[in-house]
Structures are given as C-alpha cells and as structure tokens.
C-alpha cells in the first residue's frame, strides 16, 4: 500500500491498530475495509507485525507515525492522514497527580506558550506543518 493515494486503494489491505482506539474507529468508519481489521493489544505489537510483513499498514496518530517511521521502522513510509469523521477529535494533555505542586507551574508555562505564539508554532511544525502528511480521500 506504500503507493496508495486514495482510501479506495486501502480497502483490500490488511490494516492494523490497537484495539479500542479512535484509530480502530477510523479504519472501520473511514476506510471501511473489505478485510478484517488486525487488532493488537499495543501499537508496538502492530508495528512489529508491519515490520515482519504480517500486515500491510497501521493507523494511529500522526506524531506516533512520524516517530515510528524515523526511529523504529526500517523503510517505513507514511502515505497520508485519514480525513476526520467529524464525530471525534484527538486531544492531548498533561496529567499530574491531584494536588501536584507542579500544576500552577505547568499552567503558567502553557499560558505563556499560547500568549507568545510558541504553542501554535510548535503545532504547525510537529502536527500540521511541513512535517505533516497529506489528507488522503
């Protein structure tokens, strides 16, 4: 599937992801494969099966794909991003223990990153800028 440029070209591929994730939902609802989705307990298991040729591709969040391609996979290729379904949006955050003395410090740092535009610049560079993958439809 390395040369795929459309969702239609993915329908007969064996695609894997971690069970119980929004990535699974995206495969089911966006790709709508003609094959059974290969589900794994962890994304590490899915990438291991991809590397060994047991599955044709994986679906997960874009930052993880870039990391795996650059640091873990031998010859990995990112063909693109799936379009959103409109029903869910990926959101990430920082988790601290309740009552952590770091809470105020982390909030202050995030507010400062937002205020001076650094957060938007980081998002553009790492999530949606030149390092992003094209939307495939």
Please annotate each region the language model reported.
Residues 1-137:
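Proline/Glycine/Serine-rich low-complexity intrinsically disordered segments
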């Amino acid at each position: 599937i390395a040369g795929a440029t459309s969702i239609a070209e993915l329908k007969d591929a064996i695609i894997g992801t971690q069970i119980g994730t929004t990535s699974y939902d995206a495969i089911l609802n966006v790709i709508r494969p003609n094959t059974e989705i290969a589900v794994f307990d962890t994304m590490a298991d899915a990438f291991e099966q991809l590397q060994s040729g047991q599955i044709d591709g994986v679906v997960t969040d874009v930052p993880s794909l870039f990391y795996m391609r650059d640091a873990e996979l031998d010859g990995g290729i990112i063909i693109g991003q799936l379009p959103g379904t409109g029903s869910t949006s990926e959101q990430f955050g920082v988790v601290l223990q309740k009552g952590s003395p770091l809470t105020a410090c982390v909030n202050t740092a995030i507010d400062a990153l937002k205020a001076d535009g650094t957060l938007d610049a980081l998002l553009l560079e790492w999530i949606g800028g030149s390092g992003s993958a094209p939307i495939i439809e």
